[in-house]
Amino acid sequence: MANIAIICDREFFNPFDQRVYKEVVCMKNAGHSIEILTPHTSTEIRELEGIKVRCYSTNGPPGIVAYRLIKQALKGNYDVFYCHEFDPLVYSLVLKALTKKPVVWDCHEYLVPMKKELQGNLAAALTEIVIKIASQRVDHIVTVDNLLGRQLGKFGKVTVIPNYPTIIDFPELIRTSKNKPNLLYVGGLTRKRGAKIMLEAFNIVKEEFDISLTIAGGFYDSRLEKWAHDFDKKNNLNINWLGWVNYRDLAPIFSEASIGLCLLQNQARYDRAIATKIFEYMLMGIPVLTSKGYLVEKLIEKGKCGKTVDASNAQEVAEGMKSLLQNINLEQMGIYGSDFSRKRFVWEKREKKLLKIIEKLI
């Protein structure tokens, strides 16, 4: 069995990183010794289900978090470094050079376009250069979908492990009776993820239907956050803003939803990928309204569990909402989706791939 350091790119606890959590539980259950190294608001040692989490304060000059995480990684006598996302990939250059220990890089996101969206062209260009250099030096790359797997495959060995939800965290629950239909969005809120379009469409539909909207997630852009809350107040939408919710606490929120929303905007990186939240909605028996895309359209059609729309058009999104709300088979859609997804799209059916990677490296 191996002593494995899981190195996080961002705060592990808030918002709770459900992919890291699923992976460490999988490794721990297989008998490996796991420690999570993560940026945090303060330096402390915490414990999560028997797993030690070493938290390091983000306070201090630029580069201090990198120094603190690398320092612990070097003195921890670990057998494998499992690095999540971009910054730990950079750290792996140092760790690999000094320890000669195996490194796994887990890439959850399309990092270059994400950096461009959030930080601009220069950050995107630098990210692309670093990925080309650093990813060739790791021992194995893990990622979340086939398109990203093909892109990263030119740099080294790649295994695709989709970020499917776990059955244990999304059990079949008795549906909660609702006084009125409740639309639900779960996840980060950005323009590219459809936050603005979602609110505009909801405003249109609310003029005709007595419905509610629950949002479990947070903003990355303070200007967009201000706009959203101002828009909510101005139009008396009474949105239920829950903020970030722990992954393990989402199931009761899903049980109160009538329709799940996923309105990714028209970008090439989403055409051949399916957002994790869609599988979560399906697993919990919630009909889905989602943006069009080659793979997701096939999924919704086969699962008979919702509707796809042009998510860049608020009016079309609104019409999609109305269509589902008026569909007498809405509840049956949710049942179809749950049955379809529980047989195929759950973490437990893929986690063995992760263990095989570790076994080959130790």
Residue ranges of predicted features:
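Conserved donor-binding/catalytic core segment of Leloir-type glycosyltransferases
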Residues: 5, 142, 176-203, 213-214, ...
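Acidic anion/phosphate-binding donor-loop and adjacent secondary structure
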Residues: 32, 164-180, 191-194, 328
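Conserved acidic donor-binding segment of nucleotide-sugar-dependent glycosyltransferases
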Residues: 302-303, 307-314, 323-328
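Glycosyltransferase donor-sugar binding loop
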Residues: 40-42, 212-227, 241-243
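A short, well-ordered alpha-helix in the C-terminal region of glycosyltransferases
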Residues: 329-344
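Acidic donor-binding loop of glycosyltransferase active sites
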Residues: 254-271, 286
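Membrane-proximal helix-turn-helix segments that form the acceptor-binding/catalytic region
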Residues: 25, 67-75, 90, 94-98, ...
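Short hydrophobic beta-strand element within catalytic cores of glycosyltransferases
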Residues: 37, 259-262, 280-290
